[in-house]
């Protein structure tokens, strides 16, 4: 294990960190959690209200908004861990805390798997647009089920390893972060092939539904690129750390703490990307979003009594 273990692996502290700095990081993560939950909840409301968004190609996107909203819970748990590191409170090692940490890993895992599933779905929609239109709803339901089954297996494995053989947890961590890299590899390959297809211009342009799918594909491409830029630094950093490279042993604990929290903040910001880019890139989403705010800001009409 690297010389900076995660708090769920071993309860540790950073005595050289000031209380004010710890409080500042707690505030940052707290605000990020609120923003993640609020924006993704708003995204879900917009999807539910706008009928034009109730098409099959949007099912995985809607599911991603739901998963990203739950990522806000992971940020809250991150703040709980941070308070333990800063000696604001104590986290005791027991089955309940281990279950909480399993959930802490579950939601980002589900988000990564869902992004991979979206990239494969967009690849199929780009290369086989007419066959894609014939896909039944139950296929998307099965895909969502696979996302959560895989997430459940990974989270259960983490819980069992932590309970039965906590010393081997760093091996699980390497496998976990490697799984994230594998999901990102699928995403990169999928969207690279899509980009080549779109640039070559061999896709038909005359069908309205096909053009709409192209817009959605480009939007999800931008979302994924930004997501990778936000997530990969943290994933690569933790993978290298768990490999116990000498470079990490040379970093002071205070420097590690700040670097780790900064990369974590960027990683969680990935769950803020989707609602923002949807608002700028998907016309139906933008229209529905303005409609929601317009209804809330519109004063109630008062009819005079005769």
What name fits each language-model region?
Residues 150-193, 260:
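Extracellular-loop-to-transmembrane junctions of the mid-late helices
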Residues 18-33, 56-118, 170-173:
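Extracellular TM2-ECL1-early TM3 structural module of rhodopsin-like
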Residues 193-237:
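Intracellular effector-coupling site of seven-transmembrane GPCRs
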Residues 1-40, 254-258, 299, 306:
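Extracellular N-terminal segment of 7TM GPCRs
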Residues 108-143:
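Class A GPCR helix-loop hinge within the 7TM core
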Residues 236-239, 258-306:
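Seventh transmembrane helix
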Residues 62-65, 108, 141-145, 174, ...:
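Internal alpha-helical transmembrane segments of multi-pass membrane proteins, especially GPCRs
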Residues 29-33, 70-89, 104, 108-112, ...:
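Helix-to-loop junction signature of class
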């Amino acid at each position: 294990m690297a010389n900076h273990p995660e708090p769920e692996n071993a309860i540790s502290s950073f005595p050289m960190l000031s209380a004010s700095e710890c409080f500042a990081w707690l505030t940052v993560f707290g605000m990020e959690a609120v923003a993640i939950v609020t924006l993704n909840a708003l995204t879900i409301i917009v999807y539910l209200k706008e009928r034009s968004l109730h098409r099959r190609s949007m099912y995985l996107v809607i599911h991603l908004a739901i998963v990203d909203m739950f990522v806000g819970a992971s940020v809250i748990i991150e703040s709980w861990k941070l308070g333990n590191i800063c000696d604001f409170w104590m986290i005791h090692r027991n089955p309940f805390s281990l279950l909480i940490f399993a959930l802490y890993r579950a939601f980002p895992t589900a988000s990564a798997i869902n992004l991979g599933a979206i990239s494969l779905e967009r690849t199929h929609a780009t290369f086989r647009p007419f066959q894609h239109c014939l896909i039944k709803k139950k296929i998307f339901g099965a895909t969502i089920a696979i996302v959560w089954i895989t997430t459940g297996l990974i989270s259960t494995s983490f819980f069992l390893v932590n309970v039965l053989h906590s010393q081997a947890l760093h091996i699980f961590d390497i496998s976990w972060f490697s799984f994230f890299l594998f999901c990102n590899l699928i995403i990169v390959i999928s969207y690279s092939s899509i980009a080549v297809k779109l640039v070559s211009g061999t896709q038909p342009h005359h069908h309205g539904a096909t053009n709409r799918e192209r817009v959605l594909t480009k939007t999800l491409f931008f979302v994924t690129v930004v997501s990778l830029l936000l997530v990969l630094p943290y994933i690569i950093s933790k993978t290298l750390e768990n490999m116990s490279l000498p470079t990490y042993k040379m970093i002071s604990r205070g420097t590690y703490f700040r670097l780790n929290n900064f990369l974590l903040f960027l990683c969680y910001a990935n769950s803020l990307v989707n609602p923002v880019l949807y608002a700028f890139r998907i016309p139906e989403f933008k229209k529905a979003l303005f409609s929601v705010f317009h209804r809330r800001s519109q004063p109630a009409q008062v009819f005079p009594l005769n």
